[in-house]
Amino acid sequence: MRRTFFKAKIHRATVTHADLEYEGSVSIDEDLLEAAGIWEYEAVHIWNITRGTRLQTYAIKGERGSGIICINGAAAHLNRPGDMVILATFAELEEAEARDFKPTVVLVDRQNKIVAKDAVEVPGPARRVTA
């Protein structure tokens, strides 16, 4: 039996742009995509910490090293520059794969620069990035 598991996330990223006129998707700095193991055109959940909204779209490559997180298309109504978001992906795994699987968690600062990458989530305020 296949089950759906949390695969990766870019945690507490800052939305840099919102482009209502673009066809759709979320543009993500290519450095962040690579760090999280998120592929271009992969389904991505966007959980807006600032506004409490949630949606699903797909990732496209943004300029490497730019820190860009641009919410495109209709999703721009739900996300604005300066909002803090979590970008997450999921994967379907067979039981044998899932036993040893560990998700990737990428923590970023307010400029969307990577400050940590690991596979362990620690709840609570001690883990939060405030830089």
UniProtKB/Swiss-Prot annotation:
Which UniProt keyword terms apply here? Autocatalytic cleavage, Cytoplasm, Decarboxylase, Lyase, Pantothenate biosynthesis, Pyruvate, Schiff base, Zymogen
What's the family?
Answer: Belongs to the PanD family.
Domain of life the protein comes from: Bacteria
- Which pathway is it part of? Cofactor biosynthesis; (R)-pantothenate biosynthesis; beta-alanine from L-aspartate: step 1/1
According to its UniProt record, which residues of this chain constitute the active site? S25, Y58
Under which EC number(s) is this enzyme classified?
Answer: 4.1.1.11
Q: Does the keyword Cytoplasm apply?
A: yes
Which residue stretches, if any, does this entry annotate as coiled coil?
A: none
- Tell me the name of the encoding gene: panD
Task: Tell me what organism the protein belongs to.
Answer: Anaeromyxobacter sp. (strain K)
Q: How does it assemble?
A: Heterooctamer of four alpha and four beta subunits.
Q: Which residues carry this modification: Pyruvic acid (Ser)?
A: S25
Q: How is the cofactor bound?
A: Binds 1 pyruvoyl group covalently per subunit.
This entry's Gene Ontology molecular function terms read: aspartate 1-decarboxylase activity
The protein, known as: Aspartate 1-decarboxylase
Biological role stated in the UniProt entry: Catalyzes the pyruvoyl-dependent decarboxylation of aspartate to produce beta-alanine.
Cofactor section: pyruvate
Q: Write out the residues that bind substrate.
A: T57, G73, A74, A75
